[in-house]
């Protein structure tokens, strides 16, 4: 996938139970490939739930669950999103739909994102994967 990233905006809201609701807005120009994905690895005991994607038109993508098929064509992935569960975490995937300028908004919940110690609570996570 070749893309120019114009802007990335990430908002994180924590709840009283230690979960984090994450909203990532990706403003991109895409000229090849069939899908976009966000790698979320090394999560330990943190689980990922409630994944959703919308685009600049406001269209909500259809969630297909944890069995995302990477081998489908551009048109067969359009308007769809899903997960790939790996040993180290998750890949959050969605179809590009078409080439050109797009603004994708991906949202998800990280259950158990805030960890408790004896003297404090903490959140430590790499939000944008390298590469």
Segments predicted by a language model, with ranges:
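Lumenal/extracellular ectodomains and adaptor appendage modules
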Residues: 1-131
């Amino acid at each position: 996938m070749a893309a120019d990233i114009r802007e990335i905006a990430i908002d994180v809201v924590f709840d009283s139970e230690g979960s984090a609701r994450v909203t990532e807005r990706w403003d991109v120009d895409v000229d090849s490939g069939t899908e976009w994905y966000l790698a979320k690895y090394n999560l330990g005991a943190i689980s990922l739930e409630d994944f959703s994607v919308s685009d600049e038109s406001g269209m909500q993508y259809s969630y297909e669950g944890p069995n995302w098929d990477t081998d489908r064509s551009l048109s067969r992935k359009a308007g769809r999103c899903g997960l790939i569960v790996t040993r180290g975490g998750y890949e959050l995937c969605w179809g590009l739909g078409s080439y050109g300028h797009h603004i994708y908004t991906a949202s998800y919940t990280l259950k158990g994102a805030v960890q408790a110690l004896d003297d404090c609570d903490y959140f430590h996570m790499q939000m944008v994967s390298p590469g």
